[in-house]
Amino acid sequence: MKKIALTALAVFSLAASAAYADVVKVGVIGPFSGPFALQGKNFKAGIDAYMAEHGNKVGDDTVEVVYRDVPQADPAQSKALAQELVVKEGVQYLAGFYFTPDAMAVTPILKQGNVPMVVMNAATSSIVTKSPYVVRTSFTTWQTSTPIARVALDKGVKKVISVVSDYGPGVDAENAFKAAFTDAGGEVVEAIRMPLATNDFSPIMQRIKDSGAQGVFAFLPSGPTTFGFMKAYVDNGLKSSGIQLFAPGDLTQESDLPALGENALGVLTTFHYAVSHDSPENRKFVEEARKAIGNPAELSFPSVGAYDGMHVIYKMIEATGGKKDAAKAVEAVKGMEWVSPRGPVSIDPESRHITQNIYLREVAKADDGTYYNKEIQTFEKQGDPGLKAQ
């Protein structure tokens, strides 16, 4: 069955590349229902915002976006949907991918299908190494977890305990922070990996207290797990006792801040994007993306990965004249530079990963009572340290 599917991809690729397309289809795979539907909603908001600003035409070609739903990580379903999009729908580009396993599962079909993949979220460093046709416009966990180590040391914190959820991104975050923190003279006194299903954090908080650490580095999936952890951090007296919390920005993404509330105030994170980022490009983007998403409080970081992903895809379509040519499309965006809503960015010509600023943010409360990530420091032109660690 696998051989038949790949043969179909190859035949379709030859037929589709023989002529110019009047309509160029982009297949977007992501979670548009289920527990992670808000992330898919952000994908769509970013795509809609880009097309509202730039139209749906590139030269003589009309761009059409075709969506497919993978409610939660499901590599087999993701691969099957990607094959269906390429063979039956005739998409020339694959994009989206909130979960790393879903992105990894699709990489083997890119060459046979003659299609590039633009990763709009999935944050494991090694995805770009699986195929020369992968380009990333999001971030990696290593990229956002490394600078916070410097922040902790600058705050006088020499001993930290690491607490992460025990799955791929959590392990990446733990390793990234530990490498940067210990290389600069800090000590990770203990590294705790919690099962994803953990909902009682009191024993973890006691271990943190007993460790003698001055600070906590934490990485957890957004939503209920983060809410429970943050509540326990406050309720068990860690915040009031001065044990500082450091994390990548997933912990305080904007769509979670209303639920986190006062518990998140003062938390320091490093991340590639905040909705509050102060620039003309971001103000314009946020205006359009909020229209697209409907509820302004739901806008969060996956939207900017999708917005910039469409910018890269439009450049690919322009470079290929609407023809199906994955190698030429990817070559055209190597070294590409532009000013994104998040700030200045570029596509590294070697890794095809996005180089970008990483911002230190502190959760603050606005005059209207809403919570936001206030940017207070910039780490410029950050690549992906995770690629060197492979």
From Swiss-Prot:
UniProt keyword list: Amino-acid transport, Signal, Transport
Superkingdom per UniProt: Bacteria
Gene Ontology BP, a term: amino acid transport
Family: Belongs to the leucine-binding protein family.
Name of this protein: Leu/Ile/Val-binding protein homolog 6
Species the sequence originates in: Brucella abortus (strain 2308)
Keyword Transport: yes
InterPro entries: BCAA_transport, Leu-bd, Leu_Ile_Val-bd, Peripla_BP_I
Protein purpose: Component of an amino-acid transport system.
Gene3D superfamilies (alphabetical): 3.40.50.2300
Alphabetized Pfam families for the sequence: Peripla_BP_6 (PF13458)
Source species taxonomy: Bacteria, Pseudomonadati, Pseudomonadota, Alphaproteobacteria, Hyphomicrobiales
Signal sequence annotation: 1-21
